[in-house]
Amino acid sequence: YLIRKLTQNNYKVTVVTRNIHQKSYKIKTQGNAGYIEIVEANIFDEIKIRSLFKKADICINLIGILYEKKRSSFKNIHTLFPSLLAKLSKQNKLKHLIHLSALGVSEATESEYARSKLDGEKEILKNFPLSTILRPSVVYSVDDNFTTNFMTLLNRLPVFPLYYNGQTKFMPIHSSDLVDIIFNIISKNIYSQIIECVGTETL
């Protein structure tokens, strides 16, 4: 959705993926020809990440994890990597950094996941104050199976946090609505904001 929206509005997009052979075809079909560049990179390869910033105007960070695996720890992905992006945004004088965090991270301080997200937000605002941070609720789209994926997640995680004494409610947001928010931030030059993004229904 995001690639399609940006390329339809004449933005040239560099998409960073860790597996270009697996993702290339799907990514290319999401936007206008000539407006998409696909780059394979490991986010732990700081030299490669630095090189990508030399020709960028805007950075949109969508990377996040729900469980840890080897080097993909909450601290590395949610705190240290966003901190690097913010520093590089400042060094290369980017127009904007848009970062996806998560809804409720400032309240759920007992969760390591939430703490890492909140620490990432603090690092971003400290190093590149012009950044806009989005805190979306659960994101879904018509071409995924939200219920099945959610149940799969519950089966895979050793512990699934239910905040507020187990009375957790969700207000899922459709991916196209989240994309519209991101596009409006870019087109309307919205800076230095923390925006909570939710849908219209409570589950």
Map each language-model feature to its residues:
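Conserved Rossmann-fold NAD(P)-dependent oxidoreductase catalytic core, especially the SDR/UDP-sugar
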Residues: 12-14, 65-66, 76-127, 131-137
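Conserved sequence/active-site signature of Rossmann-fold short-chain dehydrogenase/reductase
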Residues: 44, 105, 139-141, 178
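NAD(P)H-binding glycine-rich loop region in Rossmannoid oxidoreductase-like domains
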Residues: 21, 25, 30-84, 88-91, ...
